[in-house]
């Protein structure tokens, strides 16, 4: 007879049941680890997305503030140039006018210093080659004294921040003389 005692059978069933439970728990651990990794990956992705959004919004805010500052400063360019022209005539006036002009020149220099501090620089165009990104041709003049496309005169100064123009210079540009026809 191969009957096993009831104690061994119970123990055997208990062992099988424990093994099944351990196996089930190990599978559950694997499943939970996988879920945890997925949730952690999603969290890290959301965190990175949030950080990128924060940086993008900060950059957009800085660009908007820079744009607003540029537009405000651009509005001062024409009055400043008018003041420069007026001060140019002051040298031909009386001593009293020259003293007033000296004070206005100091104010003008303060404006220019503010522009410089904000990165706005004026650029010279006379004698340069015409560049449509930096110049607006308002007149042309036929001449053979300089190469075609050379800027002869500047009617309004150009200004830029870094390499980006904020107001192009208005200029007169040289063009090649038109050939004259011989009439016989």
UniProtKB/Swiss-Prot annotation:
Protein role: Participates actively in the response to hyperosmotic and heat shock by preventing the aggregation of stress-denatured proteins, in association with DnaK and GrpE. It is the nucleotide exchange factor for DnaK and may function as a thermosensor. Unfolded proteins bind initially to DnaJ; upon interaction with the DnaJ-bound protein, DnaK hydrolyzes its bound ATP, resulting in the formation of a stable complex. GrpE releases ADP from DnaK; ATP binding to DnaK triggers the release of the substrate protein, thus completing the reaction cycle.
Disulfide bonds: none
Gene Ontology terms describing biological process: protein folding
Keywords: Chaperone, Cytoplasm, Stress response
Quaternary data: Homodimer.
CDD domains, sorted: GrpE
Primary gene name: grpE
Main localisation: cytoplasm
Region Disordered: start-end pairs: 1-22
GO terms of molecular function: adenyl-nucleotide exchange factor activity; protein homodimerization activity; protein-folding chaperone binding; unfolded protein binding
Family affiliation: Belongs to the GrpE family.
Compartments reported by the entry: Cytoplasm
Cellular component, GO annotation: cytoplasm
Superkingdom per UniProt: Bacteria
SUPFAM superfamilies, sorted: Coiled-coil domain of nucleotide exchange factor GrpE, Head domain of nucleotide exchange factor GrpE
Organism placement in taxonomy: Bacteria, Pseudomonadati, Chlamydiota, Chlamydiia, Chlamydiales
Bias kind Acidic residues: ranges: 1-10
Protein known as: Protein GrpE
